[in-house]
């Protein structure tokens, strides 16, 4: 098995519903708006999120981060880099929840914590209201200039509910 990290895609797919790559990525990022899908990812593919399968894996912590987890984190960053733009966000059914999930998934600690039911319930409790701090994503305000303010606010809301 080759240990080189996968090459990150250089180009974004053109925003066209006839482009298979675009529609595949649209379907994936749209599913991230569902906290229970995030839970499914955490339980079914913990290695992708950097979640250790057991606390007995003391050897894995000395080897460094899992290459699959690093590749998935890079892919999530790549997706967030362009889905937050109005050109692409217009295709999202629930842009606020989708972009909130993509933004939170940029944080390693969040990727590890989403296996906890309390975190998923806190996300589900937030619903689609107050997503993106009240910004109107459909009007073109995607929150990509807000820095870490939204991420910190989401973390605080989740911490209060757990």
Swiss-Prot record:
Main location, first listed in the record: nucleus
GO function term, MF aspect, one: transcription coregulator activity
UniProt keyword Ubl conjugation present: no
Keywords assigned: Activator, Nucleus, Transcription, Transcription regulation
Family matches, as InterPro entries: Med31_sf, Mediator_Med31
UniProt feature, compositional bias: Basic and acidic residues: 141-162
Region (Disordered): 131-162
Disulphide bonds in the chain: none
Signal peptide bounds: none
Quaternary state and interactors: Component of the Mediator complex.
Protein task: Component of the Mediator complex, a coactivator involved in the regulated transcription of nearly all RNA polymerase II-dependent genes. Mediator functions as a bridge to convey information from gene-specific regulatory proteins to the basal RNA polymerase II transcription machinery. Mediator is recruited to promoters by direct interactions with regulatory proteins and serves as a scaffold for the assembly of a functional preinitiation complex with RNA polymerase II and the general transcription factors.
Family listed: Belongs to the Mediator complex subunit 31 family.
Name listed for the protein in its UniProt record: Mediator of RNA polymerase II transcription subunit 31
Origin species: Aspergillus fumigatus (strain ATCC MYA-4609 / CBS 101355 / FGSC A1100 / Af293)
Gene coding for it: soh1
């Amino acid at each position: 098995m080759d240990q080189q990290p996968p090459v990150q895609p250089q180009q974004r797919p053109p925003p066209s519903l006839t482009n298979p790559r675009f529609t595949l990525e649209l379907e994936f990022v749209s599913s991230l708006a569902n906290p229970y899908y995030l839970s499914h990812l955490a339980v079914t593919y913990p290695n992708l999120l950097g979640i250790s399968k057991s606390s007995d894996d003391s050897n894995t912590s000395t080897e460094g981060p899992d290459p699959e987890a690093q590749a998935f984190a890079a892919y999530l960053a790549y997706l967030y880099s362009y889905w937050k733009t109005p050109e692409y966000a217009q295709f999202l059914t629930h842009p606020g929840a989708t972009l909130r999930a993509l933004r939170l998934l940029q944080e390693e600690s969040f990727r590890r914590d989403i296996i906890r039911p309390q975190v998923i319930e806190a996300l589900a409790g937030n619903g689609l209201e107050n997503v993106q701090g009240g910004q109107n994503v459909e009007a073109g305000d995607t929150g990509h200039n807000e820095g870490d303010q939204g991420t910190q606010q989401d973390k605080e809301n989740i911490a209060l509910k757990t």
